[in-house]
């Protein structure tokens, strides 16, 4: 499975960008993924319905992800709860080839991974399924992954119940990206070093303009 290289701006959802920005602030300290206990984004409780927490077992040839907790919206999309279940068993053999490699990429690279796929609800309406994966370390190895899932339908309403199991139509991948560029969070309104800034005199006198660079 191929992944493009992307900057944080690839993430569309404002809520997911907030989650990613909190992760980036922690990452920027030492250029490594943070520990999960450090991760305390604002309004986390509001997002819990759309989050899945995974623990990562690395004793097998490929990482094994197990679900200790999940949001209720996500369990409705898959048609069952996943608490205590491995990712492979949770999504099932039909969806595993489309889903599991995305998580493995996140674990292997210890970087955020973002994906978008079109799926059909039980009435045939096209729904964009946007998934953001955030890795967390313990003793230098990825031990946890948080998945944030957002759904969007251009036609308006859709049926989330059994969204990932409603019919035989498989997800149609639109984007798979490893977020490995611009791994920092720039606060709104801040000017980055080396950005050119122009200063002009006020009207009423001969107008001159000076351009400087911030270093």
Can you annotate each of these PLM segments?
Residues 1-81, 85-89, 97-215:
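Intrinsically disordered, low-complexity terminal regulatory regions
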């Amino acid at each position: 499975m191929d992944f493009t290289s992307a900057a944080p701006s690839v993430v569309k959802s404002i809520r997911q960008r907030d989650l990613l920005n909190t992760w980036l602030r922690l990452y920027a300290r030492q250029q490594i993924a943070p520990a999960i206990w450090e991760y305390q984004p604002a309004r986390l409780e509001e997002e819990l319905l759309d989050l899945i927490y995974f623990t990562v077992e690395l004793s097998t040839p490929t990482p094994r992800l197990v679900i200790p907790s999940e949001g209720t919206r996500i369990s409705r999309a898959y048609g069952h709860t996943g608490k205590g279940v491995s990712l492979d068993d949770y999504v099932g053999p039909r969806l595993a080839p489309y889903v599991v490699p995305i998580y493995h990429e996140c674990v292997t690279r210890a970087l955020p991974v973002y994906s978008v796929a079109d799926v059909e609800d039980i009435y045939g309406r096209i729904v964009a399924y946007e998934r953001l994966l955030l890795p967390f370390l313990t003793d230098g190895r990825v031990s946890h992954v948080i998945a944030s899932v957002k759904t969007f339908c251009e036609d308006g309403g859709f049926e989330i119940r059994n969204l990932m199991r409603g019919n035989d139509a498989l997800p149609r991948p639109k984007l798979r990206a490893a977020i490995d560029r611009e791994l920092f969070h720039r606060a709104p309104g801040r000017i980055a070093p080396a950005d050119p800034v122009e200063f002009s005199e006020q009207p009423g006198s001969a107008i001159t303009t000076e351009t400087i660079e911030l270093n």
